[in-house]
């Protein structure tokens, strides 16, 4: 397991996006966090710390803000051999109701899961003190709950996805994870309907999805910046107001968006002045891209002729 260095991020940056009432609520939560965290360490454990991981982005931000608040918070990433990484993605897909790579969850997969997580637990368990809080993120980490619970930690398992319509795949994934989650003190879901049948409601909490407002991908773009990016990419027809659009990367390094030649298009650029239905996400079955296209096609007659 690898410790991820995190630079504290001023809470004032977050407060600048909030109303006065929301800022007061934030201050109250931070004060409560300081009291509850006194004498304790909070460990966040994620499968990945990659920049393209939404979970990693959220954990990095929360950890940075907590450090600024004076709360002892640490972030660790699993050591995952390639077969375990495949299994992790399979579990994630199945919890969402998708068959993913078409693989299975049998004794061989369980042996791999337990072996890898046992090795990871050994790397960290000696640092756990009685009363510490360990937050395990996603299916790949659920198997760590027993080791950290037996070490005296309060264990929280955080599930960042799911499906409201249980099917064969999601039921099998929950059956796979259930014996490990019996060791968790609490479970946190993004929606109450994602809670599995075996999880007692009074042991679960719901935290809605959120974004990092100061992240480069979430910052507000003015109209000229927006038009420049989509025209430089060839998505919209017309001349870009700017030849390049500068931005600051997550790690503070400067970057620039110039002409983009590798963008995949179907049917050519959108004509000037046309209205557009847009989804911005990575291309993944879990993001609903295909469903958006299907919904657009099914209801095309309800939209104006110039809508793309």
Language-model features, listed with the residues they occupy:
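Catalytic cores of nucleotide-sugar-dependent glycosyltransferases that transfer UDP/GDP/TDP-activated
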Residues: 1-308
